[in-house]
A protein has these predicted regions:
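Catalytic-site neighborhood detector that most strongly recognizes the C-terminal catalytic loop/helix
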Residues: 282-316
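Conserved tyrosine-mediated DNA breakage-rejoining catalytic core shared by Y-recombinases
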Residues: 163, 167-203
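Basic, Lys/Arg- and aromatic-enriched nucleic-acid-binding interface segment
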Residues: 131-160
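Alpha-helix N-cap/helix-start motif at helix boundaries, enriched for small hydrophobics
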Residues: 87, 151-152, 159, 163-168, ...
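Active-site/catalytic core of tyrosine-dependent DNA strand-transfer enzymes
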Residues: 198-252
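DNA breakage-rejoining catalytic core of tyrosine-based enzymes
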Residues: 114-133, 190-199, 216-219
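N-terminal core-binding DNA-recognition domain of tyrosine recombinases/integrases
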Residues: 16-119
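Short, basic (Lys/Arg/His-rich) helix/loop patches that form interaction surfaces
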Residues: 141, 241-280, 299
Length: 316
C-alpha cells in the first residue's frame, strides 16, 4: 500500500497525476487539465478534513455533503460530472493500490452525465453592450447610485463572478495603476488572478473606490449595502444588475451578473484573444465556457459541431 496517500494525500495525488493518471481513452492529461484536477482534488480534500473523513475513508454521504457546500450548491451538471469522474478515477486507483476497499463514486458515475444539450449562453448584443457602457459613464452623485453602477462596471468590465464581487476588498482594486487592475483572490478550486479593467469601467470604479474609502462602514469589502460591512447577497446583486439593464432597454431572459460575465467573455473573444487567454481572465481552468461562447461567433453549422464536441473536454 502507498502510505503517502494517508500521510500527505496532496503530494500523493500530485505524484500520481505526473506519473500515470490518464483519461478514459488512456491518453495522458494535458498540463492544463492536471492543474485543474489538482485544484479540484484539493478542494474536495479540504471538505473531507472539515467532516473528519480522509481519502481512505470517505463515502457517498461525504460526496452528497460536498454538493450541499456553499460552492457545491452552485455547480452545474457539467462540473458535478467532472468531480464524479475525478473521484471515480481516484478511487479505482486507491482500490488497486490497497488504500481503499471500495469505490463510493462508482454508483454516482452512472447517475451523472454530461447534459445532452446545454442552452446557448446568454449575453448582451454589441449594441446593448455599448449602451450599458455609455450608461456607466454618467454616474449619479448619491452613494447608492454610484455603488450600483460600480458593481455593474465590475461585472461588465472584468468578467468576475457574483461570489468574487462579494469577496472583493477595497485594497484589491487599483484603478490608478498602469494598466488599472483588480486582484481576484483565490477561492475554491480557483487560483488568485489579476484582471485588467476595461477602459470604460475605470472612471466609475475609481470614483467608487475614492468614495468608499471615506464612508463610515465596518470592514474592508469593496461593495457592501450595510453599515456593518456585510457581503452583498446574490439576490441584491441580481436586482442591481437587472435595474441597470432595464435602464438600457434590455429585455433578455436573464438580466444577471452571469450575463455580464458572458458579455465580457464574448467581447474578449471578438477582440482576438484566444480561448486559453480568456479562460485565464475568467479564472477558469477549462475552456468549456469560452468554447460555448465562441461557438456563438460561428456560422450555424460549425456552431452545432462545436457544441456537440464540447463534452470531450472532460478528458483533457
Amino acid at each position: 500500500m502507498d502510505s503517502l496517500w494517508l500521510t500527505n494525500p496532496t503530494q500523493a495525488y500530485r505524484d500520481w497525476q505526473a506519473r500515470e493518471a490518464a483519461g478514459a481513452d488512456r491518453r495522458p492529461f494535458s498540463a492544463r487539465s492536471i492543474v485543474q484536477h489538482q485544484a479540484m482534488f484539493e478542494h474536495f480534500r479540504r471538505h473531507l478534513v472539515v467532516r473528519g473523513a480522509t481519502i481512505a475513508s470517505f463515502g457517498t454521504a461525504d460526496v452528497d455533503a460536498f454538493w450541499q457546500s456553499p460552492d457545491g450548491r452552485n455547480y452545474s451538471q457539467a462540473t458535478r460530472t467532472r468531480y464524479v469522474m475525478l473521484l471515480d478515477r481516484l478511487c479505482r486507483h486507491l482500490v488497486f493500490t490497497g488504500v481503499r476497499l471500495d469505490n463510493p463514486a462508482a454508483p454516482l458515475l452512472s447517475a451523472e452525465r454530461w447534459p445532452d444539450q446545454e442552452p446557448t449562453p446568454l449575453f448582451l448584443t454589441a449594441a446593448e453592450d455599448a449602451r450599458l457602457q455609455a450608461y456607466l459613464l454618467s454616474p449619479p452623485d448619491d452613494v447608492a447610485g454610484l455603488r450600483s453602477r460600480a458593481i455593474v462596471a465590475a461585472f461588465l468590465g472584468t468578467g468576475i463572478t457574483a461570489g468574487e464581487a462579494r469577496a472583493a476588498r477595497l485594497a484589491d482594486l487599483w484603478p490608478d495603476a498602469t494598466p488599472p487592475y483588480l486582484v481576484v483572490r483565490a477561492h475554491g478550486p480557483r487560483d488568485a488572478r489579476t484582471v485588467h479593467l476595461a477602459s470604460f469601467a475605470v472612471p466609475i470604479l475609481r470614483a467608487w473606490s475614492a468614495r468608499r474609502a471615506t464612508l463610515p462602514l465596518d470592514g474592508d469589502l469593496l461593495f457592501t449595502l450595510t453599515p456593518d460591512g456585510r457581503p452583498i447577497t446574490d439576490m441584491s446583486l441580481g436586482r442591481i444588475v437587472a435595474t441597470a439593464l432595464a435602464e438600457i432597454g434590455f429585455s433578455g431572459a436573464e438580466p444577471s451578473p452571469r450575463t455580464l460575465r458572458n458579455t465580457f467573455c464574448r467581447r474578449q473573444l471578438l477582440a482576438g484573444h484566444s480561448c486559453d487567454e480568456v479562460s485565464q481572465m475568467l479564472g477558469l481552468v477549462s475552456n468549456r465556457t469560452c468554447d460555448r461562447i465562441a461557438a456563438t461567433l460561428m456560422p450555424e453549422a460549425k456552431r452545432c459541431e462545436t457544441l456537440q464536441a464540447a463534452p470531450a473536454e472532460a478528458n483533457e
